[in-house]
UniProtKB/Swiss-Prot annotation:
Residues 46-109 form the R3H domain. The modification N-acetylalanine is found at A2. The keyword Nucleotide-binding does not apply. It comes from Mus musculus. The modification Phosphoserine is found at S114, S158, S202. This is Sperm-associated antigen 7. It is found in: Nucleus. The keyword tRNA-binding does not apply. CDD domains: R3H_sperm-antigen.
């Protein structure tokens, strides 16, 4: 009988020591604080969502606004705002490099931003429609000029022999032909001495010399022959 009573008493849970009681008390307090923080966080999210719903509603009713930029928010707040905007049937984007500096912009559906506008915001620039239009026109003009140049092909350089036709009415076809040959010779220096390459005379001086030679030939042809 004594052995049975001893076994029953030994199987019963011993009362907690003072150390165990303190640990359990701290655990209960910590759980209570955590629950309170969770409730506060939940309440803050609810209040934030209501505030965003109010701002989005005011934005929709304001016909003078087509877009709205919000202050930087954390990731959770941005997620809530994006959800509110989607429910309202609007468009929203987040911009900013660092997470602490990222912000949300919302747009009315009929005024959705273009790719150029979004690119400006992504680079931290303000969107200027007038400058964007000027940039677009310059780009189109440059592209048009490139296409026209490609269709025309390489530029044709007029040969030196064109001087014959240019000056034939002034000094005669024969003299103009000589001038053309002279100009052509001045361009082909590959097989002549260096001294012959340096012809510093102007075109007028060369033509005057040719005229003089022509007059000299003509005067020689007109002299009477002696028997």
């Amino acid at each position: 009988m004594a052995d049975l009573l001893g076994s029953i008493l030994s199987s019963m849970e011993k009362p907690p020591s003072l150390g165990d009681q303190e640990s359990r008390r701290k655990a209960r307090e910590q759980a209570a604080r955590l629950k309170k923080l969770q409730e506060q966080d939940k309440q803050q999210k609810v209040e934030f969502r209501k505030r965003m719903e109010k701002e989005v509603s005011d934005f929709i009713q304001d016909s003078g606004q087509v877009k709205k930029k919000f202050q930087p928010m954390n990731k959770i707040e941005r997620s809530i705002l994006h959800d509110v905007v989607e429910v309202a049937g609007l468009t929203s984007f987040s911009f900013g490099e660092d997470d602490d500096c990222r912000y949300v912009m919302i747009f009315k559906k009929e005024f959705a931003p273009s790719d150029e506008e979004l690119d400006s915001y992504r680079h931290g620039e303000e969107w200027d429609p007038q400058k964007a239009e000027e940039k677009r026109k310059l780009k189109e003009l440059a592209q048009k000029q490139e296409e026209e140049a490609a269709q025309q092909g390489p530029a044709v350089v007029s040969p030196a022999s064109d001087y014959k036709d240019k000056y034939s009415h002034l000094i005669g076809k024969g003299a103009a032909k000589d001038a053309a040959h002279m100009l052509q010779a001045n361009k082909t220096y590959g097989c002549v001495p260096v001294a012959n390459k340096r012809d510093t005379r102007s075109i007028e001086e060369a033509m005057n010399e040719i005229r003089a030679k022509k007059r000299l030939r003509q005067s020689g042809e007109e002299l009477p022959t002696t028997s």
